Amino acid sequence: MGNAPAKKDTEQEESVNEFLAKARGDFLYRWGNPAQNTASSDQFERLRTLGMGSFGRVMLVRHQETGGHYAMKILNKQKVVKMKQVEHILNEKRILQAIDFPFLVKLQFSFKDNSYLYLVMEYVPGGEMFSRLQRVGRFSEPHACFYAAQVVLAVQYLHSLDLIHRDLKPENLLIDQQGYLQVTDFGFAKRVKGRTWTLCGTPEYLAPEIILSKGYNKAVDWWALGVLIYEMAVGFPPFYADQPIQIYEKIVSGRVRFPSKLSSDLKHLLRSLLQVDLTKRFGNLRNGVGDIKNHKWFATTSWIAIYEKKVEAPFIPKYTGPGDASNFDDYEEEELRISINEKCAKEFSEF
């Protein structure tokens, strides 16, 4: 009987590997055959803005025919071109239409018109983790652990497909009706087999190797996980300053201060993730994600139960019914002006 847990772990590991192998096949098919123009703008009633970005906004919309509610990301083609983000947007759409995992937001439709690109995703009504964190200050360790486990599984899935997210942060984690997470915003995500060099992401969350303009790999997402867990448990990120350059200096120095209230297990995990030396960073070693999933801080986590959403969430967002957007901030609304001539046709031909 002594080795029963080890046998169970091995069986679980094998079933995870089987799942990931099948998921890879499904992903590669959709990656190689991307869906185009699966709806049109007149099929949706635009209700209100849920969020704003540099070249567009996300709106709550209702499908006229089915009555279903969705989150529609509307991107201004000319602004995307001006800000040299064409490749990022094409990547985002191609990745979103090919992935399928419980903790990743799902793309339902995509289309374009003369002026805009549209990504229509499932609507996640609980709002951003960022807003929740601001409201409560910080999460207890069990609460942070519940969320962190879902991000670990999502990143494990993405990495098995050679995808790097590159922008994991509380603003990009939405809370669903059950209190589980949905990772959103794949604007910086990229399919990379080896290394890549692009400087992108959010200052507080950038790994040192990105700042130092070294080629970097998937390990940047595990660094970002460390920043995320720290921010959830402490209430602010580990590397913080007024100017990005000061933040970068702190990140590259690798010095992290831990409040005494954190458990020793959590401090150990964070030191292993916020590790400047890539040959020592958890997630990037011989055991891969195993070093993270088998860490003492996750000792009480049942990974299968989390994946199947069988664990009771520590927080359930208020939700009065379809179309309730009270968990999102208010924004000024403005009319979409659609040109009579097609803009940037060449740049977005494959969208």
From Swiss-Prot:
ATP binds at residues 50-58, 73. Gene3D superfamilies: Phosphorylase Kinase, domain 1, Transferase(Phosphotransferase) domain 1. Testis specific. But important tissues such as brain and ovary have not been analyzed for the content of transcript. A lipid is attached at residue 2 (N-myristoyl glycine). GO terms for cellular component: cAMP-dependent protein kinase complex; ciliary base; cytosol; nucleoplasm; nucleus. It catalyses: L-seryl-[protein] + ATP = O-phospho-L-seryl-[protein] + ADP + H(+); L-threonyl-[protein] + ATP = O-phospho-L-threonyl-[protein] + ADP + H(+). SMART domains: S_TK_X, S_TKc. The modification Phosphoserine is found at residue 339. The keyword Lipoprotein applies. Keywords: ATP-binding, cAMP, Disease variant, Kinase, Lipoprotein, Myristate, Nucleotide-binding, Phosphoprotein, Serine/threonine-protein kinase, Transferase. The modification Phosphothreonine is found at residue 198. GO terms for molecular function: ATP binding; cAMP-dependent protein kinase activity; protein kinase A regulatory subunit binding; protein serine kinase activity; protein serine/threonine kinase activity. This is cAMP-dependent protein kinase catalytic subunit gamma. It comes from Homo sapiens (Human). The lineage of its organism: Eukaryota, Metazoa, Chordata, Craniata, Vertebrata.
